[in-house]
Amino acid sequence: MFSVRVPLATITDQQQLQVSPLKALSLADKENTPPSLSATPVLASKVARRILQDVAEPESKVSTNPSVEDEPLLRENPRRFVVFPIEYHDIWKMYKKAEASFWTAEEVDLSKDIQHWEALKPDERHFISHVLAFFAASDGIVNENLVERFSQEVQVTEARCFYGFQIAMENIHSEMYSLLIDTYIKDSKEREYLFNAIETMPCVKKKADWALRWIGDKEATYGERVVAFAAVEGIFFSGSFASIFWLKKRGLMPGLTFSNELISRDEGLHCDFACLMFKHLVHKPSEQRVQEIITNAVRIEQEFLTEALPVKLIGMNCTLMKQYIEFVADRLMLELGFNKIFKVENPFDFMENISLEGKTNFFEKRVGEYQRMGVMSNSFTLDADF
């Protein structure tokens, strides 16, 4: 049975920095473990019966944290085990859209990439391998949050369906990136280095630590953490996606760039879903707090792609990349219902039809002509070809 985590008051970024994100992920605080009575001195059987009576009658308890009870997404929902009748049609539509976009790593042809890979300059190979290392680790971190926090907190069935499917897709993304590394990198020591990027690469570790800190933060509200992980999938991924699309513009690495199309479409939908969940919240973080989270993510991503792993290695302009990350952040702010922060234009014309909004041409055009037939039409037929 899933349990409801009770968000407490928010904490400052300075306090967050003092928490070791890896040590903060504890399994010891699961609420579905019954409270221990070992510390209660049971002096008589009458007292013992009274204690057990109190445990058996939770309805008599008065909630000390009304914020959870005030949130339709988070409060106890006895109907969470069944899907119908649909109550949140917009959330359900998002789930069906994700379901219709299902794909697997085996469908991506990497046979032509090896020849391209060997023809790349050393700087280009260095950049691509390190970006893939970040991606391979980051999807696992997103799943850690979905499993440990969001899926346990949210009590709305439609949202749980989406989170469950998102977990499956993040696994496929992680498999795809691992397969790309395994295909391109022949040296076993270099592969091991890339697969352990969170420990071996400081620039990747910095981004991972920021995300892990939000997972382990027991005091941040659900709303703050939704914004933080919208930033992870909408901002932390955006520049790296753009850099791979830059390779596509140059006609390079068809397998890598096709998988990038599929994954960026998925992440755009995940980011849109986070914004939808945010809109359903009754108690939202203030615009100032949201700006603080978003600008922090922007600074980390700009540093990653212009200093730690500069896009100039593949011939891109670092200044324009900084601007693109700010453009993506502004778009996310608008989607969350707030004002733009940076007020800049999209500097990359090749990214005009490739955004992380989810309202892109990806889904409508059926990227790579791939979409599960009939899923979005709500129709059932027995005359399909098998």
Swiss-Prot record:
UniProt entry keywords in alphabetical sequence: Cytoplasm, Deoxyribonucleotide synthesis, Iron, Metal-binding, Nucleus, Oxidoreductase, Phosphoprotein, Ubl conjugation
InterPro entries assigned to the protein according to its UniProt record, in alphabetical order: Ferritin-like_SF, RNR-like, RNR_small, RNR_small_AS, RNR_small_fam
Keyword Iron: yes
Catalysis performed (reactions): a 2'-deoxyribonucleoside 5'-diphosphate + [thioredoxin]-disulfide + H2O = a ribonucleoside 5'-diphosphate + [thioredoxin]-dithiol
GO BP of this protein: deoxyribonucleotide biosynthetic process
Enzyme Commission designation: 1.17.4.1
Modified residues (Phosphothreonine): 33
Localisation per UniProt entry: Cytoplasm; Nucleus
Motif interval(s): Cy: 49-51
Sequence positions that bind Fe cation 2: 170, 233, 267, 270
Entries under Gene3D superfamilies matching the protein: Ribonucleotide Reductase, subunit A
Cysteine pairings via disulfide bonds: none
Residues that coordinate or bind Fe cation 1: 139, 170, 173
Post-translational modification: Phosphorylation on Ser-20 relieves the inhibitory effect on Wnt signaling. Phosphorylated on Thr-33 by CDK1 and CDK2; predominantly in G2 and M phase.
Positions of the catalytic residues: 177
Additional detail: Two distinct regulatory sites have been defined: the specificity site, which controls substrate specificity, and the activity site which regulates overall catalytic activity. A substrate-binding catalytic site, located on M1, is formed only in the presence of the second subunit M2.
Record-stated family: Belongs to the ribonucleoside diphosphate reductase small chain family.
Record protein name field: Ribonucleoside-diphosphate reductase subunit M2
Organism annotation: Mesocricetus auratus (Golden hamster)
Gene of this entry: RRM2
